[in-house]
Amino acid sequence: QRQMCIRDRKYGTRDPFEIMDQMNIVVGETSRYKTLKGYCFMSCKTIYVMISSFLSEEEKMIVAAHELGHIILHRSQLKMAPMQDDTLYNMTDNTEYQANLFAADLLIEDEDIEEMVQNEDLDYFGLCSSLNATPELMSFKLYSLTKRGQAYHMPMEIQSNFLAK
């Protein structure tokens, strides 16, 4: 719920890069690590996010939203050590799980899903395609909606390593 409040009331956008810019978070790209998708850290009270330059634009958006989730939900942990993500959509680590739900809720509007599912000709992958969402990100979104009391059938399990492919 926090991501919706942030987006709608304070920043007025779903774009994690725009939100981080408004929050004065320094965002950069790195080609230093081949397997690391992104990481965030705090130094001298400034928050930094680094995203792999090897990723597609779609993956960069997802990683940025995921790292923003860490910044908003787990800020106190940033003071201790960088938060690194070499595999997104990890279901075993609670902080990663929370950042994944945050990213899905930030990037995909509840109303867009409600509108799209009214179309009986649209299957799960058609829904993903129509909303420019990966099937894995959509799984997190539908799981989030289900946790909030809306009934959606999830035809695929949440995969913890889909960006590792």
Could you tell me what each predicted segment is?
Residues 1-165:
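Active-site hotspot residues in diverse enzymes, especially metal/ion-binding acidic/histidine motifs
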